């Protein structure tokens, strides 16, 4: 990963082995627009945002341009390479880039998972530039977000597919060319199918979260997983993400878990334990998008079945079942809640429409980002003030737990209401607290756990029951 300051650019250049395009020479890929054409197209700008499609060299250049403009709050890094060797680039925006600050939640946007679904890729490039611009202007909303959130933006998870789709002549692109990665793998069907595991666990008992815990080696050895998939799995496991959105194209709707149906049927509402907050998160996006939230909008395509759409949102399984998707994988393998947003009826619309898509989605992108500051947050520590990592935070009535990060910090997204939260960890007495959760900001609830490692074995079970009763009764 690149460091801060001048060393960050040098590290990036070394990783990419392609500094020529930044220093004056062009890094030309086969089929990429000529340099003169790119320079002419860059005149179509507004506040530094170029409303155009960015091929791979241009994508790199756009991200570095943001970094050069906002070096104090940004960093560029890569999570790995595509099958054809292109970097899976991420730009991070934070008041302390490169560092997880205890208590500060981590957010990610991912675009272009299907290479021919191009609007999300461009919107995320535009978003990075917009956040930089507005931070420098002193926009209070953006300044507060960047000071309180670590934001990661990956414009393209499938750069190989995008290059294939973009290389087609003319503006009218084939509906499928470039969808898959260079191996022909649909990345949104390529993640470990954790839905099937959790559905069994619902019936027979078993874990309801972090279903791939300590299994990185198995992931690396799985030859069925694409390199792009493996890279994102490591990313999800390495950073304590709280909230995410995966940007697609082909329809206009915000889709929430579960994506895969329990019965195996093609269409069936498949609620997760966090159905209420997921519905709210999806509405936080759709409600700011005029076309998406329009109840009178006709279907994108003649034979589309959008009967499951409500206020521009849908449950994934109710729309159509998707096994092996990234959305549900986030929820079941980590603490990260993710939705999938379909941004456009056309997958690769004409370039002159990109500005309109930006105007339709800008407020939605910011609104969704703000949702990370909902629910409950805090720290789990022992009586000496030491952080307890991997403590379990459970919510009464919701069969999905989250865990604390290495600094003992945790975040639990919830809709407004009254809840009982319990923090527990091996070797410690569990503590339960009651909390009234507003819409925002997140309520702060810290836990101090007492170790019983020194107590006699015969005392431990009795003490655990007594402590649980007392903590629930006295709310301490």
UniProtKB/Swiss-Prot annotation:
Manganese is among the record's keywords: no
Record note on cofactor: Binds 1 zinc ion per subunit.
Known EC number: 3.4.17.10
Annotated Gene Ontology cellular component terms: extracellular space; transport vesicle membrane
Annotated propeptide span(s): 26-42
Catalyses which reaction(s): Release of C-terminal arginine or lysine residues from polypeptides
Residues the entry annotates as binding Zn(2+): 114, 117, 248
GO biological process, one term: peptide metabolic process
Description of how the protein assembles with itself and partners: Interacts with secretogranin III/SCG3.
Function: Sorting receptor that directs prohormones to the regulated secretory pathway. Also acts as a prohormone processing enzyme in neuro/endocrine cells, removing dibasic residues from the C-terminal end of peptide hormone precursors after initial endoprotease cleavage.
Protein family: Belongs to the peptidase M14 family.
The protein's name: Carboxypeptidase E
Lineage: Eukaryota, Metazoa, Chordata, Craniata, Vertebrata
């Amino acid at each position: 990963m690149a460091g801060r300051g001048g060393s960050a650019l040098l590290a990036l250049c070394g990783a990419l082995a392609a500094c020529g395009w930044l220093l004056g020479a062009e890094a030309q890929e086969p089929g990429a627009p000529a340099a003169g054409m790119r320079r002419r197209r860059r005149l179509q700008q507004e506040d530094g945002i170029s409303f155009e499609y960015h091929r791979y060299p241009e994508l790199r250049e756009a991200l570095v341009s943001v970094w050069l403009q906002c070096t104090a709050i940004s960093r560029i890094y890569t999570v790995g390479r595509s099958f054809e060797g292109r970097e899976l680039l991420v730009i991070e925006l934070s008041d302390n880039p490169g560092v997880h600050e205890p208590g500060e939640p981590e957010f990610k946007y991912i675009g272009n998972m299907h290479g021919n679904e191009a609007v999300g890729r461009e919107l995320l490039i535009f978003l990075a530039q917009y956040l930089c611009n507005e931070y420098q202007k002193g926009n209070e909303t953006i300044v507060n977000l960047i000071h309180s959130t670590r934001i990661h933006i990956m414009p393209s998870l499938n750069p190989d597919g995008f290059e294939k789709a973009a290389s087609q002549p003319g503006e009218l692109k084939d509906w499928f060319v470039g969808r898959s990665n260079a191996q022909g793998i649909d990345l949104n069907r390529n993640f470990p199918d954790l839905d099937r595991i959790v559905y069994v666990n619902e019936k027979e008992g078993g874990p309801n979260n972090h279903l791939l815990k300590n299994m990185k080696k198995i992931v690396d050895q799985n030859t069925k997983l694409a390199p792009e998939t493996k890279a994102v799995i490591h990313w999800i496991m390495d950073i304590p993400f709280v909230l995410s959105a995966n940007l697609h194209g082909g329809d206009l709707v915000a889709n929430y878990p579960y994506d895969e149906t329990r019965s195996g049927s093609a269409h069936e509402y498949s609620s997760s334990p966090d159905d209420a907050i997921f519905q709210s998160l999806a509405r936080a996006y759709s409600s700011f998008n005029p076309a998406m939230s329009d109840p009178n909008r006709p279907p994108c395509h003649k034979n589309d079945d959008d009967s499951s759409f409500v206020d521009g949102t849908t449950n994934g399984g109710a729309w159509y079942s998707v096994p092996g998707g990234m959305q549900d994988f986030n929820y079941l393998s980590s603490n990260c809640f993710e939705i999938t947003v379909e941004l456009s009826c056309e997958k690769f619309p004409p370039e002159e429409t990109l500005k309109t898509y930006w105007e339709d989605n800008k407020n939605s992108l910011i609104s969704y980002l703000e949702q990370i500051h909902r629910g409950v947050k805090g720290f789990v520590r022992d009586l000496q003030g030491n952080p307890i990592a991997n403590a379990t935070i459970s919510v009464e009535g919701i069969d999905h737990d989250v865990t604390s990060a290495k600094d003992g910090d945790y975040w639990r997204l919830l809709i407004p209401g009254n809840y009982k939260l319990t923090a527990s960890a091996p070797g410690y007495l569990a503590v339960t607290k009651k909390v009234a959760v507003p819409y925002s900001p997140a309520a702060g609830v810290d836990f101090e756990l007492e170790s019983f490692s020194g107590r006699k074995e015969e005392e431990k079970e009795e003490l655990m029951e007594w402590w649980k009763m007392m903590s629930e009764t006295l709310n301490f």
